[in-house]
From Swiss-Prot:
PANTHER family assigned to the protein according to its UniProt record, in alphabetical order: ATP-DEPENDENT CLP PROTEASE ADAPTER PROTEIN CLPS (PTHR33473:SF19), ATP-DEPENDENT CLP PROTEASE ADAPTER PROTEIN CLPS1, CHLOROPLASTIC (PTHR33473)
Species of the source: Zymomonas mobilis subsp. mobilis (strain ATCC 31821 / ZM4 / CP4)
Region (Disordered): 1-21
Transmembrane segments: none
Name this polypeptide is given: ATP-dependent Clp protease adapter protein ClpS
Function of the molecule: Involved in the modulation of the specificity of the ClpAP-mediated ATP-dependent protein degradation.
UniProt xrefs under Pfam families: ClpS (PF02617)
Gene: clpS
Subunit organization: Binds to the N-terminal domain of the chaperone ClpA.
InterPro entries, alphabetized: ClpS, ClpS_core, Ribosomal_bL12_C/ClpS-like
Domain of life of the source: Bacteria
Length: 107
């Protein structure tokens, strides 16, 4: 080392590299409302307005999709939010003695 002219003992150079953590976006989940023969259409619209903050026109469109196709998409959310909304709708329907069902699936 005595022959190395580029080596400096007194040099206190510190290199700091900053890395930004790579965070993944959360997996989106669709909340689906399922058709049944007993829940009134008005109640379905009420649920869509109340729990998914839809206006009357959007809620009616989704309700008709549920009625005609058997299933309708209420929205796309993170898993925790989707699960909460499903539980809210099902609990609200039970309280009002309706068999309305919601489920979630990966978007």
């Amino acid at each position: 080392m005595s022959g190395d002219k580029d080596f400096d003992k007194d040099s206190d150079v510190t290199v700091i590299t900053r890395t930004t953590p790579q965070t993944k976006k959360p997996q989106p989940y669709k909340v689906l409302m399922l058709n049944d023969d007993y829940t009134p259409m008005e109640f379905v619209v009420l649920c869509l307005q109340r729990f998914f903050r839809m206006g009357i026109e959007d809620a009616t469109k989704v309700m008709l999709q549920v009625h005609q196709r058997g299933v309708g998409i209420c929205g796309v959310f993170t898993y925790e939010v989707a699960e909460t909304k499903v539980n809210q709708v099902v609990d609200f329907a039970r309280q009002h003695q309706h068999p309305l069902q919601c489920t979630l699936e990966k978007a």
